[in-house]
Every structure is written in C-alpha cells, then in structure tokens.
From Swiss-Prot:
Name of the protein: Probable cytosol aminopeptidase
One Gene Ontology cellular component annotation held by this UniProt entry: cytoplasm
Swiss-Prot/TrEMBL keywords: Aminopeptidase, Cytoplasm, Hydrolase, Manganese, Metal-binding, Protease
Chain sites annotated for binding Mn(2+) 2: K269, D274, D292, E353
Needed cofactors: Mn(2+)
Function field: Presumably involved in the processing and regular turnover of intracellular proteins. Catalyzes the removal of unsubstituted N-terminal amino acids from various peptides.
GO molecular function, one term: manganese ion binding
Signal peptide annotation: none
EC number: 3.4.11.1, 3.4.11.10
Ligand binding (Mn(2+) 1): D274, D351, E353
Location in the cell: Cytoplasm
CDD domains: Peptidase_M17
Major place of residence: cytoplasm
Protein encoded by which gene: pepA
Length: 502
C-alpha cells in the first residue's frame, strides 16, 4: 500500500474515489459541503431523500457526481459531529478501507483526516489512518494451501490535510504509521506461527533477518551451555522438559549520537509453547498457548519499528525464548531453584513459569547498565480477569516511568492500566524452604507475579506490562493483535524526542 499526503480542494482531485464525511443527522462535513456546492446540491438532495443518515459506519458510494473530476465519491457516516472520538474514528477508517476494497477502487483521496476528532491533531489522525488501514488489510494465510480470494484492489491512498504547512507533519505521521504497522505485522506473523515452527531458535532467526537490513542493529544469542555458565538455573529449569533448546536473543540497536547514552532495555517473555509442564494445563484452549510468546513478539515488533524509523536512541531488545513441556527431565513442583541473582525459589506450580524465565533475564540485563527496563509478558490469567481484553496491566515502583508508559498507551490507543505493587502483596510469596515461592495463590495473581519480578529489578528503573489479555484474540477472530507494539513504539518515539505534531 502506498500512502501520501496533500493539501487541496476536493473539486480539483482527479482520482478513482474521493472520501468525505457526513454527520448525523444528514449534515455535511465542511469538505462535503464544498462538493455539494460545485455539484449544485446533488449530495444534499440525496441526503434529504434519506439515502444516508450519517450514522457511524454508514457508507454510500456515488458515481459520476456532477462537476466532480473523480469517478466516485464515497460518503462516510461519522455520527454526531461533537461526539466523534478516537475509537469511532478508527472504526470509520477501517470500514472505509473495507468498502473501497469491496467496490474495486484502486486509489482514493481521503478527506476524513480533516474531521475534528476530540483532543487529536493532524499528526494523530493521519498516523492512525495509516495504522488502521494496514491492520484492516492484515491476514495470515502463509500455511494455507488454498489462499482466500479476497478482493483487494486498493493500492494508493492520499490523505488530505487542511493547510500546506501541515504537509510536513502529515509526511512524518505516514512514516511513523508505516513503521508501527510493519512492527505490528511482524509481531502478528511471528505470534501466529504454529509452535512446531516458531520455537526459540525461530525467534532468533527473525531477529537476525531484521539485522541483515539494519546497519546499527546487532543480534547475538545465549544458548543453554552459556546460560549454565552464567548461573541462569531458573530459566534453564523451565526449558528442561523440551527437546527445543532455550535461546535468549539479544537485539542491540545503537541510534544515539552520543555513544555513552545508556540503553533502554525491552524484555519479552518468549514461551513459544506453554503446556504448563508437569502442572499440565487443561486440553481445551491449550492450542492458544503458542501465544505465550506474545511479549517477545511485541518486543521484536517494536524493534522492527525502531529500526525502520532510525530513532536517535540506544535500545536493547531481549527475547527470552523457551518452551515449557512435561517429560521425565522436566522441573517439578517442590523443586527449589537458585536464580542467577543468588535468590532461591520454591516451585509450587510449573505453570507459573514465565516469571522463572524473566527473573534471570532481569538479572542478566544489569550488565548493560540500562537507563530503564520494561518487560512485557503474557504472564497471568489473573490479569485477563482483572482488565479483560482492552487494557494491559502496568506495574512499576517508579512513578515517572509508569506515567510515561501510560501516556504512550493513551497516545497510541494501546492503553494500559496501572495496578498496585504494594509491599503488603509481597507476603503472599513467602516460603518455609526458600527465599520465595513462584506462586502467590489465587487472590491478586497478576500483582503477586509482578511482586515476584520486582525482587530481581532493584538496580534500575523498571516496569512490567502484563499483556495476557491484549496480545491475542480467541474465538472466531483468533489471532495475534499486534499489541503492545504501538505502546512500546510510542514510548520510544517520546523518549527519542521526535517531533510529532503541531
């Protein structure tokens, strides 16, 4: 898909289709009024006849509108003018793209980016239009022998901005939107891959592919032999039951002009399949445990977006690849593990494995002397119960970092909700035999999991994102969502100090 931005009047556009908005009840947007004027009331007459009410998502395709150079005009219902918010705007863009494809338009000039969206500027509207367009066109059929015959002729989309001085902002928005979309696309592709293909080594191979096309990205891996020398016994224990070797992939991006700038570290839980181990999960829905590497998929997607934008910061992405399987060699409930930090953990349940992998990675990244560390993981079902599918759980003892991430989530529409990390919850992890247990019981499960991780993140500013509810969808629309790529990428854009708006 080719995107561009321009500033012009609708009557001068020579395109396959012009897209303009209509408000409820039957009220023309400013651009639609211009078209109505040059067409001598053609559009307003249709509305008076009741052809379109203007309700959100309603579509009316017009052919050969009088005095309009473009072959078609697509009227898009936008709801009530004062109520148009970001959620409705995204839905309208998605419906518009689907309609353009279904009706055979190869190119279009879209004036929806001129609509007033509460609290949003031109940069946001153009970037969100790009991201919504790309997401609506995504499909995963790489492993199907019979590909779907979806009609997708749309090849070029031009977004109109109100003034010429906003062209630079619009171009930047397209650049950023394309990068975020590419990151989400990669995240979804990797996460949707079946576990017989996507194993820890596969994660490493995907990282190397990005490095092949990015001069300032280097990729190294840490295998089981090296982990053993490092004392990463907790990480190793989780993968012990699998024939697939555990692999930790390090993606080091150097974009800062100042070589001494401390790196931001992003850690992704990469359980490419989680059977639960000896504490075996129920069979129903176990196929979705291929998505237990959603955190790593999010990190590799964010790193892809970062490389495409070439942001002037230093970032290290760590993919904690592992597979949790039952076997005679698997770790057991009752085992006591000595972590890389030296702290000991009593295993109460082998299905609380993500934290056992992440705790050693949190210790490992101390060597990078990081500016800050954000780990992202499909860590707990308890977070799904607490927040559902709309918000990721955010945990941090560092208020400025927490606020940065929450703000990035609001900016990108990939929202998070801050959860408590109070000392009282630490008591749930007490063990009579070790420094702590790996399970705090049913109450406050997502919080006690974060409390566990916090014990290994004392030497830097740290935040934890639990994306168990947001990384993938179940049911008829089963598949990766591409989250938290938008949140992580927006956080990096903000950190880089890149100009984003007016």
């Amino acid at each position: 898909m080719e995107f561009s931005v321009k500033s012009g009047s609708p009557e001068k556009q020579r395109s396959a289709c012009i897209v303009v908005g209509v408000y409820e009840p039957r009220r023309l947007s400013g651009i639609a009024e211009q078209l109505d004027k040059i067409s001598e009331g053609y559009i307003s007459n249709l509305l008076r006849r009741g052809d379109l009410e203007g309700k959100p998502g309603q579509m009316l395709l017009l052919h050969h509108v009088p005095n309009v150079l473009s072959e078609r005009v697509l009227l898009v219902g936008c709801g009530k003018e004062r109520e148009l918010d970001e959620r409705q705007y995204k839905q309208i863009i998605t419906k518009t793209i689907n309609t353009l494809n279904e009706t055979g338009s190869m190119e279009a000039v879209c004036f929806l980016t001129e609509l007033h969206v509460k609290g949003r500027d031109t940069y946001w509207k153009v970037r969100e239009a790009v991201e919504s367009t790309q997401n609506s066109l995504y499909s995963f059929d790489a492993l199907k022998t019979r590909k779907g015959e979806t009609r997708r002729p749309l090849r070029k989309l031009v977004f109109n901005v109100p003034t010429r001085r906003e062209l630079t902002v619009g171009e930047r928005a397209i650049e950023h939107g394309m990068a975020v979309s590419a990151g989400m696309h990669l995240c979804r592709d990797v996460a949707n891959m079946p576990p017989n293909i996507c194993n820890p080594a596969y994660l490493a191979s995907q990282a190397r592919q990005i490095a092949e096309n990015t001069e300032n990205l280097t990729v190294t891996t840490v295998g089981e032999e090296q982990m053993e020398k490092l004392g990463m016994n907790s990480y190793l224990a989780v993968g012990r039951g699998s024939d697939n070797e555990s692999v930790m992939t390090i993606m080091e991006y150097k974009g800062a002009v100042d070589n001494t700038q401390k790196p931001i570290v992003l850690i992704g839980k990469g359980l490419t399949f989680d059977s639960g181990g000896i504490s075996l999960k129920p069979g129903e829905g176990m196929d979705e445990m291929k998505y237990d590497m959603g955190g790593a998929a999010g990190v590799i997607g964010a790193m892809k977006a970062l490389c495409d934008m070439q942001l002037p910061i230093n970032v290290i992405g760590v993919l904690a690849g592992c597979e949790n399987m039952p076997s005679s060699n698997a770790y057991r409930p009752g085992d006591i593990l000595t972590t890389m930090s030296g702290q000991t953990v009593e295993v109460l349940n082998t299905d609380a494995e993500g934290r056992l992998v992440l705790c050693d990675v949190l210790t490992y990244v101390e060597r990078f002397d990081p500016e800050l560390v954000v780990d992202t993981a499909t860590l707990t079902g308890a977070c799904v119960i607490a927040l559902g599918k709309h918000a990721s759980g955010l945990f941090s003892g560092h208020n400025p970092l927490a606020h940065e991430l929450l703000n990035a989530g609001e900016q990108s529409g990939d929202r998070a909700w801050r959860m408590p990390l109070w000392d009282e919850y630490q008591e749930h992890l007490e063990s009579p035999f070790a420094d702590m247990t790996n399970l705090g019981g049913r109450p406050a499960g997502s919080i006690t999991a974060a409390c566990f991780l916090s014990r290994f993140a004392k030497k830097y500013n740290w935040a934890h994102l639990d994306v168990a509810g947001t990384a993938w969808n179940s049911g008829a629309n089963k598949g990766s969502t591409g989250r938290p790529v938008p949140l992580l990428t927006q956080f990096l854009i903000n950190r880089a100090g890149v100009d984003q708006g007016e």
